[in-house]
Amino acid sequence: MYKRQVFSERGKSILNQKGELVCKSPFPSMPNKFWNDPGGKKYQSAYFLKYKNIWHHGDYAERKKNGGYIIYGRSDATLNPGGVRLGTAEIYSVIENFKEVKESIVVGQKWDNDVRIILFVVMSKSSSLNDDIISRLKKRIRSEASPRHVPSKIIQVSDIPRTKNGKIVELAVKNTIEGSKIKNVQALANPNVLNEFKNLKQLKF
C-alpha cells in the first residue's frame, strides 16, 4: 500500500482535518523527471519543494478515520476568506445542479485586507445571469456548503480558461484579476479568454 497521508502546513500527519495530500513512497505512474529539465530543478520544485523528500501534488484533501479521502480541489486554488481555508470543490458541487449554468470558475480576490470569493459563470444558451439566479445560487451555496462559501460577486463571462487537456485554470484567473504575473501561459488552450477578466468594473467595488 502506498503511504498516502494528509499533512498540515507544518508537515504533520493529520486525520479528519483538511490539508495537503502527500505520498511518502513511490507509486505507479509517478514521473521521475521532466523533459528538458537536466538538473531536475523544475521537477523538484513541482513535487518536493513544500515538504522535504515527500511527494506533494497540490491537492487539498481530508483523510477520514475509515481510510477514505475527500478531495476538495487544488490547494493553490483554495479560498481564505476571514483566514478560514475553503475548498473550491464544495462550491462547484452546488453549482453543477443549476441547469442555467454551463460552466463556472471560482477564485479568491484580495480585498480590504482580506479575501473575498468571486464566482464567474458561463450561462447556457437559453439563460442569462439575473438577480433571481444570483439569489438562488447564493442561497443553495449557503445551505449546502456554508455561509463562508457564499460568493461576494457572481459575474457572467463568455468562456473560462483551461489547459490543453481541458482543466480549468483558477490560478490564472486569480492572477489576472489581481494584476499579477500569469505563469505557464503557453500551457493554456485559450489564453485570450483571460482578457475578459481584466479590469472588470464589478471587481472595483
Per-segment meaning from a language model:
Residues 1-5:
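Conserved small/polar residues in nucleotide/adenosyl-binding loops
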Residues 8-9, 16, 63-64, 162-163:
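Short, acidic, Ser/Thr-enriched surface-loop or helix-capping motifs
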Residues 154-157:
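General small-molecule cofactor/ligand-binding pocket signal
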